[in-house]
């Protein structure tokens, strides 16, 4: 915790931190559209089989010259159970007799129809083009749409696992810059992917980069911030993610073509990559990894930016070494992921934090995936989701500062669980109430993410924070992958998935009681700091 002494000499919340936030917040805002891009880029428009009599571009398809388009559609495409044109089958031969029959009479058998062997015709009133229309991901191939989302999620999972290790090895700044460039290139190339498999590979790489950007954007700035302002920074960062969802709704509404949307979302990250050269590496990480000269330069640069004039005289290698000697000695022992579980206090903390992340991610993604059933158009729904999450995340800042870390998490997790469980008993006819409860659940789930993130940073020591962050984010990605799979349980009981979504956060809220309160406490740098923190809390109790 000695780094807090050095931070107080260079300024824990000044011009440098503000400039850092000016870079980080916009990059987080524009990152979310990349993660949720398939909500629009892979939208499935209305479609039907291509029919010679209707869709022959030569103009000779309608040989009668007197039949309307509706009449030609009637004799060419069978009706489904809702008396709407089938999306995946057509008549082998025109059924002229249907022109003289009541619309509710079906005089043809399954043998009279065939799949869409000549392709499909898509409704372009909402989206002129999506990856679904480009590669015909409908009917028997509709499941391929979920392959893209699965691979993106898998990329984020792999990024969560690897990101912490490479960041501890090569530094937060270098890995962040690499991933900013990788995301810009891969998602720009995805807009021009020649085949569906190539598109999938590029989206996997985009997911890999996205997760590391989220992690490495948050860690350095929180390490440069004084303890009593860390909650504010985390809330601002998570609030930027919510604003990103609102931005996505607006971008998708303006740029309906999926390729244009990809390019528009990707170009800003080339700019972020160029601007990131002025980012300063975490001095805490530099010192802990025995790069004292570089750490001293970083501290002096921060002091100059913050207007601390006597920093050159007061800050030198001897001061840094003597202040951080205990942490330097502890850091000489190479840390691994196993170190998170060797110490009883660390083992308890990491296991609880991982479960909390997992328990909140399942209802968050479970609710988000099924928001389409609310009935609103997807553009408005995306904006509404982001707006509600942003408002409740701002509320989380007040609860974190006034009620503490533990009580905030308990409050929000209980509200998530109770709102989801209550919604299972609300009739579908009561749409307003269902939407209100769904928004409450999503908003509180977003606030829980912010609360857990603040508590996580204050519970895990610097030497292990990036690796622990990788494990934490891995648990989040696993929860996200499981959330939609739980919907298959509806074959046993229609409300069973929702009951599971509601129970997990309630259990998580109860487990939070096992963690210590860390409000206004300095960040631990080593495992020994964690032990000392534990002793101090016991003495106060």
UniProtKB/Swiss-Prot annotation:
Tissues expressing this chain: Detected in fetal and adult liver, and in adult kidney.
UniProt topological domain (Extracellular) ranges: 37-145, 215-230, 281-349, 399-406, 458-472, 517-541
Subcellular locations according to the entry: Membrane
Cytoplasmic side: 1-15, 167-193, 252-259, 371-377, 428-436, 494-495
Residues the record marks as carrying a glycan: 56, 102
GO biological process: organic anion transport
GO molecular function: transmembrane transporter activity
Protein name: Solute carrier family 22 member 10
Source species of the chain: Homo sapiens (Human)
Encoding gene, per UniProt annotation: SLC22A10
């Amino acid at each position: 915790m000695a780094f807090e002494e050095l931070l107080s000499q260079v300024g824990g919340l000044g011009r440098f931190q503000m400039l850092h936030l000016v870079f980080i917040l916009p990059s987080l805002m524009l990152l979310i559209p990349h993660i949720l891009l398939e909500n629009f880029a892979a939208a499935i428009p209305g479609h039907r089989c291509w029919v010679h009599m209707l869709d022959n571009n030569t103009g000779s398809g309608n040989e009668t010259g007197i039949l309307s388009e509706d009449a030609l559609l009637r004799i060419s495409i069978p009706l489904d159970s809702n008396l709407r044109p089938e999306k995946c089958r057509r008549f082998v031969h025109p059924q002229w007799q249907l022109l003289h029959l009541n619309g509710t009479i079906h005089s043809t058998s399954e043998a009279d129809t065939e799949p869409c062997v000549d392709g499909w015709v898509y409704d372009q009133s909402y989206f002129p083009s999506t990856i679904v229309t480009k590669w015909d991901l409908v009917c028997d191939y509709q499941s391929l749409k979920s392959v893209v989302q699965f691979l993106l999620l898998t990329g984020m999972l792999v990024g969560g696992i690897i990101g912490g290790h490479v960041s501890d090895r090569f530094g937060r700044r270098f890995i962040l810059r690499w991933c900013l460039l990788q995301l810009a290139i891969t998602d720009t190339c995805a807009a021009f992917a020649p085949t569906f498999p190539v598109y999938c590979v590029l989206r996997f790489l985009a997911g890999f980069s996205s997760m590391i950007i989220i992690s490495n954007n948050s860690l350095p700035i929180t390490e440069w911030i004084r303890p009593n302002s860390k909650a504010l920074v985390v809330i601002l960062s998570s609030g930027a993610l919510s604003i990103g969802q609102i931005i996505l709704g607006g971008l998708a509404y303006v740029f309906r073509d999926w390729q244009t949307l990809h390019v528009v979302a990707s170009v800003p990250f080339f700019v972020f990559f160029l601007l990131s050269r002025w980012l300063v590496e975490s001095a805490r990480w530099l010192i802990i990894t025995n790069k004292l000269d570089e750490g001293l330069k970083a501290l002096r640069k921060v002091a100059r930016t913050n207007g601390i004039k006597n920093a050159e005289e007061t800050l030198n290698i001897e001061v840094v070494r003597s202040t951080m000697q205990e942490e330097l000695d502890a850091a000489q022992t190479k840390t691994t992921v196993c170190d998170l579980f060797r110490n009883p206090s660390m083992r308890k903390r990491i296991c609880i934090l991982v479960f909390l992340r997992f328990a909140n991610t399942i209802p968050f993604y479970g609710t988000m995936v099924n928001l389409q059933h609310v009935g609103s158009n997807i553009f408005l729904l995306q904006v509404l989701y982001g707006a509600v999450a942003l408002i409740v995340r701002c509320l989380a800042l007040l609860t974190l500062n006034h009620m503490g870390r533990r009580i905030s998490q308990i409050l929000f997790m209980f509200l998530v669980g109770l709102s989801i469980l209550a919604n299972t008993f609300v009739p579908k006819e009561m749409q307003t109430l269902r939407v209100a409860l769904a928004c409450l659940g999503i908003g509180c789930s977003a606030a829980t993410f912010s609360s857990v993130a603040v508590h996580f940073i204050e519970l895990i020591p610097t030497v292990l924070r990036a690796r622990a962050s990788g494990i934490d984010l891995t648990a989040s990605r696993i929860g996200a992958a499981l959330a939609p799979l739980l919907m298959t349980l509806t074959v046993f009981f229609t409300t069973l998935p929702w009951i599971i979504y509601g129970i997990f956060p309630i259990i998580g809220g109860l487990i939070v009681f096992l963690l210590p309160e860390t409000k206004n406490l300095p960040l631990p740098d080593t495992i020994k700091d964690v032990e000392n923190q534990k002793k101090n809390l016991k003495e106060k109790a």
